[in-house]
Amino acid sequence: MALSLGLGLALSALVIGIRPQVVVPFGLSALGSALLGSLLIPGLRRWKAGQVIRQEGPQSHQKKAGTPTMGGISFLPVGLLVAGIWSGWDPHWLAVALLTLAYSFVGWLDDWLVIRQQSNKGLSPQHKLLLQVGVALGFCVYLAWQGIPTSLTLPGIGTLSLGWLFWPLALFVLVGTNNAVNLTDGMDGLAAGVVAILLIGLGLLHRDPELSVLAFTLSGACLGFLVHNHHRARLFMGDTGSLGLGGALAGLALLGDQLWALALMGGVLVAEALSVMLQVGYFQYTKRKTGTGQRLLRMSPLHHHLELGGWSEVQVVGSFYGVTALLVGLGWAWWHWTGM
C-alpha cells in the first residue's frame, strides 16, 4: 500500500507539472463528489437501496449486504458538470457526457431491478448486452458523423488504416470496456481507484484540451467517491457507476485515437476481463471433454482468485493501484519518447 501511495504522489506531481490548468477542476470534482456522496448515503439507506451480494462470491463479502449502492449518481454527474462548465459545453464533451449517462442509465436500471427483486439478478445478460450494443451503435454514428479517422495509432510504429474494420473494433471497445470496469468493481475502492489513475493517464495524453479536462474531472470525481468507497465501504458505485465509467473511458479513447493507451494503461481492466473469459471458456471446454468442468482460477475475476489465495482486500486493491500507476507511467514515457 505504501508503494501505491508513493506512485500516486509521483503521478500527481507529474500531472501538476505537465497540466497545471486541470488542478482546479480536478479538485472541485473531488470535493463535489465527496460532499454529494455524504448527502446521498442517508437517503439511499432510507430508500432501502442496499446491495444484494451474490451467493457464489467469497463468503467474506456477505457481511457487505445492505451497503447502499447506485453510488454512481453521486460522482458521475459532478465530473461531467464541472468539465462541461470548464470546456464551455464543447460538442465532444457533450457526446462523451451523453455516452456516459446512457450507460449509467443501463446500469441504474440493472441496480434498480436487483434492489426491487432483492436478488442479484437484474437485467438478463441478453437484455443488458442489447442495451450496451445499442448505446455503442449510437456513439459510432456520432463518430462517423464527425469524420473520425478510421485508423489506429501505435506510438513508435505508426498509423494503421483499418477502413470499415474500425467500426467492429469501436463496438468491441465500447461494450468490452463497459464490462471490464463492471467486472473490476468487486472490492472496496478497486474500480474507482484503478479508473481514477487510468483517467489521469488518458488526460495527460489527450490532444483535445476539453476532453483532457473531462478525463481529469472524472478522475477527481472518482477520488471524491473513494472517501465513501474505500475499505470498509459505506457506498458502492453499482452498475450505475461502473457502466458509466466504462463508457467514459471508451469514448475518451476513441475520440482521442488512444485505443493503445486504453489497452496498455488499462492493463488491470484487461486482465480482469480476460480472467473471466478464460475461466468460463476452460470450464466449458473441460466439461465437454471430460463431463466435469474444471477451473483455471479459484474464482474469477482475478481479484477474487487472489483473495481466496490469502490476500486481503487492501493488499489486492493496493497492488492493482500500483500496477495501474506503473502502466500509466510506462504509457506516458512511451508516448513521450516516440514523440507522438
From Swiss-Prot:
Family the entry assigns: Belongs to the glycosyltransferase 4 family. MraY subfamily.
Residue spans crossing the bilayer: 22-42, 69-89, 95-115, 129-149, 156-176, 186-206, 209-229, 235-257, 316-336
EC annotation from Swiss-Prot or TrEMBL: 2.7.8.13
GO biological process: cell division; cell wall organization; peptidoglycan biosynthetic process; regulation of cell shape
Pathway info: Cell wall biogenesis; peptidoglycan biosynthesis
Its biological purpose: Catalyzes the initial step of the lipid cycle reactions in the biosynthesis of the cell wall peptidoglycan: transfers peptidoglycan precursor phospho-MurNAc-pentapeptide from UDP-MurNAc-pentapeptide onto the lipid carrier undecaprenyl phosphate, yielding undecaprenyl-pyrophosphoryl-MurNAc-pentapeptide, known as lipid I.
Primary location: membrane
Domain of life: Bacteria
The protein, known as: Phospho-N-acetylmuramoyl-pentapeptide-transferase
Enzyme class at the top of the EC tree: transferase
Subcellular location, record wording: Cell inner membrane
UniProt catalytic activity: UDP-N-acetyl-alpha-D-muramoyl-L-alanyl-gamma-D-glutamyl-meso-2,6-diaminopimeloyl-D-alanyl-D-alanine + di-trans,octa-cis-undecaprenyl phosphate = di-trans,octa-cis-undecaprenyl diphospho-N-acetyl-alpha-D-muramoyl-L-alanyl-D-glutamyl-meso-2,6-diaminopimeloyl-D-alanyl-D-alanine + UMP
Cofactor: Mg(2+)
Keywords, comma-separated and alphabetical: Cell cycle, Cell division, Cell inner membrane, Cell membrane, Cell shape, Cell wall biogenesis/degradation, Magnesium, Membrane, Metal-binding, Peptidoglycan synthesis, Transferase, Transmembrane, Transmembrane helix
UniProt membrane topology term: Multi-pass membrane protein
Any GO molecular function: metal ion binding
InterPro entries: Glycosyl_transferase_4, PNAcMuramoyl-5peptid_Trfase, PNAcMuramoyl-5peptid_Trfase_CS
Cellular component terms per the entry's GO annotation: plasma membrane
